[in-house]
Curated annotation (Swiss-Prot):
Residues annotated for [4Fe-4S] cluster 2 binding in this entry: C195, C199, C202
Biased composition annotated in UniProt, kind: Polar residues: 484-493
Family in the record: Belongs to the methylthiotransferase family. MiaB subfamily.
Subcellular location: Cytoplasm
InterPro entries named among the record's database cross-references: Elp3/MiaA/NifB-like_rSAM (IPR006638), Methylthiotransferase (IPR005839), Methylthiotransferase_CS (IPR020612), Methylthiotransferase_N (IPR013848), Methylthiotransferase_N_sf (IPR038135), MiaB_methiolase (IPR006463), rSAM (IPR007197), rSAM_horseshoe (IPR023404)
Domain Radical SAM core as annotated: residue spans: 181-414
Region described as Disordered: spans on this chain: 1-25, 484-510
Organism: Beijerinckia indica subsp. indica (strain ATCC 9039 / DSM 1715 / NCIMB 8712)
Entry protein name: tRNA-2-methylthio-N(6)-dimethylallyladenosine synthase
Residues involved in [4Fe-4S] cluster 1 binding: C43, C79, C117
Domain (TRAM): residue spans on this chain: 417-479
Length: 510
């Protein structure tokens, strides 16, 4: 896997270490009689999966709640990427066990489900260690949730971690328009799952399975539904998204990620496209050209490299060298000069010497990153790296991580400060923190706040950057030169294209 940890603006490695924990919840409609609480950890794929689980259960009478104590069904949608992932889940289950006992005593039975990659990896062990769990379901079989919940009503303690032959996407239900609108103007769309790379530090091939790609028509249908309910930006996601290899029934030919994005970009009403996460080895010429040729494709790319040492890259089974990555970056920047880059780094991989670590720092200096995620290597059971005898001392790993993060933070702040005084096209997404304020995202995924009318939510507007804080910008809304937006947020495709072409010409220092 390439390192599925993309996030708009990584506030710190500590926030990244928190695994983007997201608790989903909304006000219950009166027509529903049961309440659902979903807590999702990890990558964007888990956010997408959590939404699909809620959509599957809505016809069963479940409405989401933000309070676990109000729930009839609690789902922990877990991630297995980081250190001690399973133990964190068991710690959370300990709290839920007490909650379940309290609710049971009050005459309100509660079901607990463990889903996601920890469920896939641990399986029966979860039931053995925590008797309060009713169901364990893997990421490739959660489309069976309604049926499985009916079964656990009579036989608690079920495990379904199979990799079924049928495509789970054929069984997922489309969300209701009001639910899409509630989730905002941006949405994730899974186009690819699994990974065939087998990096020696990574569990994803074992928990998510082999690479599979959805058909083009199914993806376009999902995006069309999202656009109709107000979505203006989609992020195409996959564990190794640029390995996408679908089929396009319109052309009768195989489809790449680049050709898929061209189809998506042509859909009326959609303003922006992003994709994540990518592996350098699958960054083909057509995908690089897409950054030049598709105005709606944002100039931000998360492309994990993990290390700057050829020796460590070989030990990680990355199948590329540091020089290959640097050449790739040069080609991408030649195609899209204003592109901002993000990456993942692992320090303290077994066998890493001080010289290997210095090579990583040198690569960072040479590339210049707008943002990045960085981690100490942690042994993942069942992966080749975990069995190596040359493990690095924890103190050494901590020291190296601190040095690396200091350099990355310096680059991030320099990138953000370079935006002050510039005019950026901002997609406004929601009301801001204060009255009269609206919040949005720049093309580079930074959060931005400006004084403006809520009618502008769902539109792209030019904003002058006034201040650059550690994690967000403050800007001044400018009058559009391409015509007025409607209150519904419909924007002319021509105006958007001109704005993004102008943005493309800006030199972005790092």
């Amino acid at each position: 896997m390439s390192g599925f940890n993309d996030s708009p603006v990584p506030e710190s490695a500590e926030k990244a270490d928190g695994l983007l924990s997201q608790e989903r919840g909304t006000q219950d409609p009166l027509v529903n009689t049961r309440k659902l609480f979903v807590k999702s950890y990890g990558c964007q794929m888990n956010v997408y999966d959590a939404e699909r689980m809620a959509d599957l259960l809505a016809p069963e009478g479940y409405a989401e709640t933000s309070a676990p104590e109000d729930a009839d069904l609690v789902i922990l949608n877990t991630c297995h990427i980081r250190e001690h992932a399973a133990e964190k889940v068991f710690s959370e289950l300990g709290k839920l066990r007490l909650l379940k006992a309290e609710q049971q005593a009050a005459g309100r039975p509660v079901k607990i489900v463990v889903a996601g990659c920890v469920a896939q990896a641990e399986g029966e062990e979860i039931l053995r260690r925590q008797k309060a769990v009713d169901l364990v379901v893997g990421p490739q079989s959660y489309h069976r949730l309604p049926d499985l919940l009916r079964r656990v009503a009579h036989t608690p303690g079920l495990v379904d971690t199979e990799f079924p032959a049928e495509d789970k996407f054929d069984h997922l239900v489309a969300p209701q328009p009001e639910k899409i609108a509630e989730r905002g103007v941006g949405a994730f769309v899974t186009v690819q799952e699994g990974c065939d790379k087998f990096c020696s530090f990574c569990v994803v091939p074992y928990t998510r399975g082999a690479e599979t790609s959805r058909p083009v028509e199914a993806i376009l249908a999902e995006v069309e539904t999202l656009i109709a309910s107000g979505v203006r930006e989609v992020t195409l996601i996959g564990q190794n998204v640029n390995a996408y290899h679908g089929f396009d029934a319109m052309t009768g030919a195989p489809a790449s990620l680049a050709s898929l994005m061209a189809r998506v970009a042509a859909m009326p009403g959609l303003l922006r496209i992003r994709y994540t996460t990518s592996h350098p080895n699958d960054m083909g010429e057509d995908l690089i050209a897409a950054h030049r040729d598709i105005p709606a494709l944002m100039p931000f790319l998360h492309l994990p490299v993990q290390s700057g040492s050829d020796k460590i890259l070989a030990a990680m089974n990355r199948r590329h060298k540091a020089g290959d990555y640097l050449e790739l970056i040069a080609s991408i920047r030649a195609a899209r000069p204003d592109i901002a880059l993000s990456s993942d780094f692992i320090v303290g991989f077994p066998g890493e010497t001080e010289a290997d670590f210095e090579a990583t720092l040198a690569l960072i200096e040479q590339v210049g990153f707008a943002s990045a995620f960085s981690f100490k290597y942690s042994q993942r059971p069942g992966t080749p790296g975990a069995d190596r005898p040359d493990q690095i001392d924890e103190d050494v790993k901590a020291q190296r991580l601190a040095r690396l993060q200091a350099l990355l933070e310096e680059q991030r702040q320099a990138f953000n400060k370079a935006m002050i005084g510039r005019v950026l096209p901002v997609l406004f997404e929601k009301p801001g923190r204060h009255p009269g304020q609206i919040a949005g995202k720049t093309p580079y995924l930074q959060a931005l706040y400006a004084e403006g009318d809520k009618a502008l939510i769902g539109t792209v507007q030019p904003v002058e950057i006034l201040e650059a804080g550690p994690n967000s910008f403050h800007g001044r809304l400018l009058a559009r030169e391409t015509g007025q937006e409607s209150a519904q947020g419909q924007e002319s495709a021509q105006g958007m294209e001109r704005m993004e072409q102008n943005a493309r010409a800006w030199e972005v220092p790092v």
